[in-house]
Each structure stands twice: as C-alpha cells, then as structure tokens.
Curated annotation (Swiss-Prot):
Keywords: Cleavage on pair of basic residues, Disulfide bond, Hormone, Secreted, Signal. Belongs to the insulin family. Heterodimer of a B chain and an A chain linked by two disulfide bonds. Residues 1-18 form the signal peptide. Brain peptide responsible for activation of prothoracic glands to produce ecdysone in insects. Pfam families: Insulin (PF00049). The keyword Disulfide bond applies. GO terms for cellular component: extracellular space. This is Bombyxin A-3 homolog. Residues 47-75 form a propeptide. It comes from the Eukaryota. It is found in: Secreted. One of its GO terms (molecular function) is growth factor activity.
Length: 98
C-alpha cells in the first residue's frame, strides 16, 4: 500500500513538473489523476441509454457484435478507459474529461 501511495505521489509530482509523456492510467490510479487534474469535478459515468432501436444499431441483417464494431468506426469518442487504460495517454487527453 505504501509503495502505491509513493508511486502516485511521484506520478503527480512528475505531472506537475510539466512532464507530458504518455502514461497508462487504470482503476484507482485513473480516478486519482482525474480528481487531481480536474479539481474533483470530472465527468461522472452516466447510465447507458438503451432502446430496442439502438440495441440493434438499425442494422438487423448484421450480427450484434459486428454492428457494434461498425458503429464505433464512425468517429465516436472512446471512453476514458479505452483512451488511457488500454493505451498510454497524456495529461492533455485526461484534461479533456474535466
């Protein structure tokens, strides 16, 4: 536990010093960094909207998995986990969620 806290303190210090190298942020680390950068006012997760039309993505001839893949290819903004947990992201990308 102490090691994790030390690591987070060092990470926050590096970000405060202007280090803009991409890092991977997941779980608690992501929440702490958002809280620090956004002054405790980052966007909270909303309940997903689902309807019978959006569930099928309007493409009834496609399998649901393939329809979701195609829907994502239209330039829809990814969630913060996709941007910062699955791949490294910068402080500027994190600030986009404030």
């Amino acid at each position: 536990m102490r090691t994790q806290v030390l690591f987070l303190v060092l990470e926050v210090a590096a970000m405060a010093s202007g280090d803009d190298t991409p890092h991977v942020y997941c779980g608690r680390r992501l929440a702490i960094m958002l809280s620090y950068l956004c002054d405790n006012q980052y966007l909270m997760k909303r309940t997903p909207y689902t309807s019978s039309e959006s569930e099928g993505y309007g493409w009834r001839w496609l399998a649901p998995q393939r329809a979701r893949q195609l829907a994502g290819a239209r330039g829809k903004r990814q969630g913060i986990a996709e941007e910062c947990c699955n791949k490294p992201c910068t402080e500027d990308e994190l600030l986009g969620y404030c």
